[in-house]
């Protein structure tokens, strides 16, 4: 069962990916994570990527796709995988399709979590963090005492990129980047869009109902 997971910031994509990993026993593959792992381990492609990263440049698609191909060939991807954060552009989607054909692991389904902007802005701009790693939400999960962490007693704060204006900018970028991919996979007949406004467990049940066809 080979899956691509799309969803804007705040849609709960990370939460659902983790639940899918636990339930199906297939790995979540985040391009950021495997890129950092290759750099850390000093692989040939990792060193090539590092040369660009050190200059503050984007890692070229051909380097990134090589790293992804190697990861998808590992034993834990035998029964499937969840691609998270890739592809980001139509050329990347074409390159991905080419390597998946080569290793005979085509994508079964592209899952797209859809949540209205106003809900996402509310979810993200209400987030509060603590330096100890605890997280809260002004409405759904506030600390017991205003601005004080329940766990360590430290001051909770809002991240600079979690303000309503910053969140809307991130959503605009996401839509501009992702819409062509939504159209790309819709044309291929493998896109399924889900309502991400429901409760976490309800969304997960919806996901499982869709994936039952491929398990």
Swiss-Prot record:
**Could you tell me the EC number(s) of this protein?**
2.7.4.3
> Which transformation does this protein catalyse, written as a reaction?
AMP + ATP = 2 ADP
Instruction: Answer whether the UniProt record assigns the keyword ATP-binding to this protein.
Output: yes
Q: What function does this protein fulfil?
A: Catalyzes the reversible transfer of the terminal phosphate group between ATP and AMP. Plays an important role in cellular energy homeostasis and in adenine nucleotide metabolism.
- Per UniProt, the enzyme's principal EC class comes to transferase
Q: What is this protein called?
A: Adenylate kinase
Q: Species name for this entry?
A: Methanosarcina acetivorans (strain ATCC 35395 / DSM 2834 / JCM 12185 / C2A)
**Subcellular localization, per the record?**
Cytoplasm
Q: Which family does it belong to?
A: Belongs to the adenylate kinase family.
Give UniProt keywords alphabetically.
ATP-binding, Cytoplasm, Kinase, Metal-binding, Nucleotide biosynthesis, Nucleotide-binding, Transferase, Zinc
Superkingdom, taxonomy of origin = Archaea
Q: Which GO terms describe its molecular function?
A: adenylate kinase activity; ATP binding; nucleoside diphosphate kinase activity; zinc ion binding
Q: Which GO terms describe its biological process?
A: AMP salvage; nucleoside diphosphate metabolic process; nucleoside monophosphate metabolic process
State the residue spans of region: LID: 126-162
* Chain residues that bind ATP: 10-15, 127, 135-136, 198
Q: In which pathway does it act?
A: Purine metabolism; AMP biosynthesis via salvage pathway; AMP from ADP: step 1/1
Q: Which residues bind Zn(2+)?
A: 130, 132, 149, 152
Its principal location? cytoplasm
PANTHER family hit by this protein: NUCLEOTIDE KINASE
Region: NMP; residue ranges are 30-59
């Amino acid at each position: 069962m080979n899956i691509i997971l799309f969803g804007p910031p705040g849609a709960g994509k990370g939460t659902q990916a983790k639940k899918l990993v636990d339930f199906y026993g297939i790995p979540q593959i985040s391009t950021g994570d495997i890129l950092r792992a290759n750099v850390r381990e000093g692989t040939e492609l990792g060193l090539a990527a590092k040369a660009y990263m050190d200059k503050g440049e984007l890692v070229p698609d051909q380097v990134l796709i090589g790293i992804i191909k190697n990861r998808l060939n590992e034993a834990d991807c035998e029964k499937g995988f969840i691609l998270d954060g890739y592809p980001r552009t139509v050329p990347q989607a074409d390159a991905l399709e080419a390597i998946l054909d080569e290793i005979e692991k085509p994508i079964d389904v592209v899952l797209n979590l859809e949540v209205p902007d106003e809900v996402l802005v509310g979810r993200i701009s209400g987030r509060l963090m603590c330096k100890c790693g605890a997280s809260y939400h002004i409405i759904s999960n506030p600390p017991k005492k205003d601005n004080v962490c329940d766990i360590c007693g430290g001051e909770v704060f809002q991240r600079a990129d979690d303000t309503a204006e910053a969140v809307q900018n991130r959503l605009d970028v996401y839509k501009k980047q992702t819409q062509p991919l939504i159209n790309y996979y819709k044309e291929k007949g493998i896109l399924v869009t889900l309502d991400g406004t429901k409760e976490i467990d309800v969304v997960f049940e919806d996901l499982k109902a869709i994936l039952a066809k491929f398990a």
